[in-house]
């Protein structure tokens, strides 16, 4: 009951639907001292509002490659949008619908709430939600629809679509009527 009340309050404050504000369950397995497979963590992940209409939940973060197998939980670290140097970030991001009037009011200097790794190579930003991370990203649209803006074009994506993004300037805008949920795996990369 407490989770439902918290989700309802967060939904109202951040412009999300109650369904979008629900936490996701994460199950992490590992090995015990006998080398038997066990469940290390099985819990709902905390909801983390990122900006009005956007929530992000980190499931796992690593700092090196190959990543160490660990029994500690690295998901609560505050690291920003990009993965750590030589690391990875596994997350889900929810995007609430953004109507044209609200989109027009986004301040040009917003640049995804101050992400410092945007834009690439001095290319002017065409939208306040444009940003860039020095990472190779695998993404899958889990539900809803969204537009991925690039420097010279936009691509409309729907549930089930997969994206492989190679450190490009981009932005996400949900012009639909329903929230959009995207699964991301970000891996630190080297500049071309």
Label the model's feature ranges.
Residues 44-46, 91-133, 166-169, 188-190:
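Conserved short histidine dyad/triad with adjacent acidic residue
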Residues 125-127, 131-133, 138-159:
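A short beta-strand-loop-beta hairpin characteristic of the jelly-roll/cupin
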């Amino acid at each position: 009951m407490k989770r439902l009340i918290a989700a309802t309050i967060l939904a109202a404050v951040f412009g999300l639907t109650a369904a979008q504000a629900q936490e996701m369950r994460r199950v992490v397995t590992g090995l015990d001292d006998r080398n038997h497979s066990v469940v290390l963590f099985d819990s709902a992940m905390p909801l983390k509002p990122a900006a009005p209409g956007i929530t992000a939940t980190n499931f796992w973060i690593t700092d090196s490659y190959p990543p160490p197998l660990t029994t500690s939980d690295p998901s609560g670290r505050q690291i920003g949008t990009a993965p750590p140097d030589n690391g990875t970030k596994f997350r889900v991001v929810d995007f609430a619908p953004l109507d044209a009037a609200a989109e027009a009011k986004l301040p040009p200097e917003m640049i995804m709430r101050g992400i410092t790794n945007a834009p690439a190579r001095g290319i002017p930003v065409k939208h306040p939600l444009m940003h860039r991370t020095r990472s190779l990203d695998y993404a899958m649209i889990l539900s809803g629809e969204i537009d991925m803006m690039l420097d010279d074009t936009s691509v409309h994506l729907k549930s089930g679509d997969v994206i492989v993004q190679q450190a490009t300037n981009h932005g996400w805008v949900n012009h639909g009527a329903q929230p959009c949920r995207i699964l991301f795996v970000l891996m630190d990369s080297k500049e071309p």
